[in-house]
Amino acid sequence: MISVTTPLTGTRVTYHDPCYLARYNRITEAPRRLIEATGAQLFEMPRHGADTFCCGAGGGRIWMSESHAEGERPSEQRIREAQALGRLDYCRVTCPKDLAMYSDAAKTVRAEFEVAELTALIELAMTQAELLTSEAEPFTSDQPRTLVSSSATSNRSATTP
């Protein structure tokens, strides 16, 4: 399991079960245990677990026109379900299609919570204490990350033909 030194107490989260993970693979409890391990409080949407609601991407609804002549997008309906839960800090997902669909829908319906991968909540819980006690600036996504040290790169290039 994960090691959290400063729990995300008071953080309000909802989780969207992705279609294939929940309906076909019946994996619904593991993501909830991860949320629980962070110390965040989980608020369930009415349709969750194996009864989850599709984001719309898999059925071609991702290509609906912007005019909404066909009605509200499934992803917007789902974000409204999350909004109906009251104040939320985060809506977490574990599917790349869900991330794209719900991020866009959250902007469209002006949701006041962040849509992101579940792993971002775990990262926050694991690094929060470090960020609170560190004087260093926190990492932001626009900063380059070095995955291989320069010495390792130069050693490798010296031995690579």
Language-model features, listed with the residues they occupy:
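Iron-sulfur cluster-binding electron-transfer modules in prokaryotic oxidoreductases
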Residues: 1-161
